[in-house]
Structure formats: C-alpha cells, structure tokens
Design a protein with these regions (language model features):
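Cys-dependent protein tyrosine phosphatase-like superfamily
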Residues: 1-102, 107, 115-163
C-alpha cells in the first residue's frame, strides 16, 4: 500500500459510501476491491498524481473491474453548484443501484467530504451542516475548508429553490 494511501486512509461515511485518499498503485486499488468497492468517483486533477501513478491506477481499476468517473476539481479550490450536483447525482444513482461507491480527492478531507455531505443530506433529508457532522463522526479527518462549506450551502440553497 502506498504511504499516502495508508496515512490518509478511507472510511465509510454512509451506507455504501466510502470517502478517502486517492489510490496511487495496484496495491491501493486491491485494498478498495477488498472492501467491495464497485464504483469510484474521482475528484483529483491529473497534476496531483506522481509520474506514472495515474496510468497504474487506471490499469489496476480495469483489472479489478472497478468503474471510475472523474470530475477534476482544484485541490483547496472552490466547488461550483453544477460540479457538486453532478458528483452528488452520479454517486446517488450508483448507490440507488446497489453499488458500493468510493468518493475520493487527494487526502479525503475536503473535496470528497463536501460532496459526501451533499449525498448524506439528500439521502437522510437533513441539512448539509448536520450531514458534515455525521461524516466527521465516521471519518474525523473529513473537514472541508470554510469556502467549500459555503459552496455546499450555496448548492443546497439553489437546489431547494428549484423544487
């Protein structure tokens, strides 16, 4: 297992939804396979990977039969409402279909926690701030930056207004 993946790890934050660090090699992907991950939603940019790591992960995912979708978001950056909506809806569809979903950013602390809070808020019919609290109970390192929390609340408000 890569040092990064071992250090930052992952955790199940809701039924069927696991968030964490980005896998960097075949051993990291094998660890995800061992916990029955069937789909990955990747929020990492190509530039965040070490040389050759992205290609190794793609090959390992294919070999493991794990499907991946990506939405490259800037590390430490903001999340637009449309980006949150896409990631949340995709993961929600997968979860509804019985998939076990791994949602990751680089360390599993910020971008992935923000999107996971949107998923938990919708699934549990709770406010996003409460969803973040639940996620932190299950994965204490999950802590979106202040501007990412604001992005989540902006998305939530816009979504509610459309109903």
């Amino acid at each position: 297992m890569s040092d990064w993946f071992e250090h930052f790890g992952y955790g199940e934050v809701a039924e069927g939804l696991v968030i964490g660090a980005y896998p960097q090699d075949v051993v990291d992907v094998a660890a995800l396979s061992q916990v029955s991950i069937t789909r990955i939603f990747n929020l990492v940019q190509d530039a965040e990977y070490d040389d050759g790591a992205r290609a190794a992960v793609v090959a390992a995912l294919e070999d493991a039969g794990i499907d991946e979708q990506r939405l490259e978001l800037i590390d430490y950056g903001g999340l637009l409402p449309g980006q949150i909506e896409l990631a949340v809806n995709t993961a929600m569809d997968w979860l509804h279909d019985g998939e076990r979903v791994y949602l990751h950013c680089r360390a599993g602390w910020q971008r992935s926690a923000t999107v996971a809070a949107g998923i938990v808020a919708l699934r549990e019919d709770i406010e996003p701030e409460r969803a973040l609290e639940l996620i932190r109970e299950r994965k204490p390192t999950a802590k979106p930056l202040a501007h990412q929390r604001r992005d989540l609340l902006r998305w939530w408000t816009m979504r509610k207004q459309k109903r």
